[in-house]
Curated annotation (Swiss-Prot):
It comes from Bradyrhizobium sp. (strain BTAi1 / ATCC BAA-1182). InterPro entries: P-loop_NTPase (IPR027417), PanK (IPR004566), PRK/URK (IPR006083). SUPFAM superfamilies: P-loop containing nucleoside triphosphate hydrolases. It comes from the Bacteria. It is found in: Cytoplasm. The gene is coaA. Belongs to the prokaryotic pantothenate kinase family. This is Pantothenate kinase.
Amino acid sequence: MDMRTTEQQYNPYRVFTRQQWAELRNDTPMTLEPGEFSKLRSMHDRLDLKEVEDIYLPLSRLLSMYVDAAQRLYYAQRQFLGIRDRKMPYIIGVAGSVSVGKSTTARVLQALLARWSPRPKVDLITTDGFLYPNAVLERQGLMQKKGFPESYDLPRLLAFLSDIKAGRHTVRAPVYSHLTYDIVPNQWVEIDQPDILIVEGVNVLQTGPLPRDGKAVPVVSDFFDFSVYIDADEAVLRKWYVKRFLSLRDTAFHDPRSYFNRYALLSDEEAIATAIAIWERTNLANLEDNILPTRPRATLILKKGADHEVETVALRRL
């Protein structure tokens, strides 16, 4: 038996080359201006006109179909039950490793989706705001595992998503500072009944152990209607992380308020060694143990090459 044929037969995804995916754009119009790309792009990530045209416009077209189908199903169920619920936002999860470009993808999707007709309200949050404060992580011995599932205030995040999905007004999310590397006290992002909410974070597709008593144990992805996993080989991710660390050493780390200010005067050799040590101790371990195993749970997988361009797209079969 041809093992490749068998693998393709049972693969839950349809896999597209970049060219095949780009052809699915159809007549979806470009609604972004060239000057917006630099504002949407994260440090050292790549975003240009061709990337938006080839990858994100087809994805925008697909998402418009998914959202429309979800709305029609919602109204059909409401009619069947004879009830009048509040509208339920469509929630999109964006997952992937540190330094893979999740934030760029999330911001591009927000910009494109907000320009659909008739101009839906599209909000974006990151799960960084639901990390425990550093004081709590220090007390629990988890500072070296910041970003691991156990470093998040999961009950608070689940309550937030439950309130959003229930259509409640003015749901608040904590604010996280990448400068101070900590939760900002008494600051909040307010989300007020969006049509679409994008939730970005490394572990948003994470599952928990199944309870033996059969009781329901919710996970973050239970609230998602669609999910995107941004993928890249580990060697590529490591290279991007080191490059980003070197850039931050020359910029943000010089701010006295920066949690990483102590790295600002490192030589290139010292900075590279430090970045690799952090990558291997924390980010690689998190990737291998927690993030990468969730990739098969995504609706769509964008696989990037070393130049930051998406090379293949995998869409889960219905």
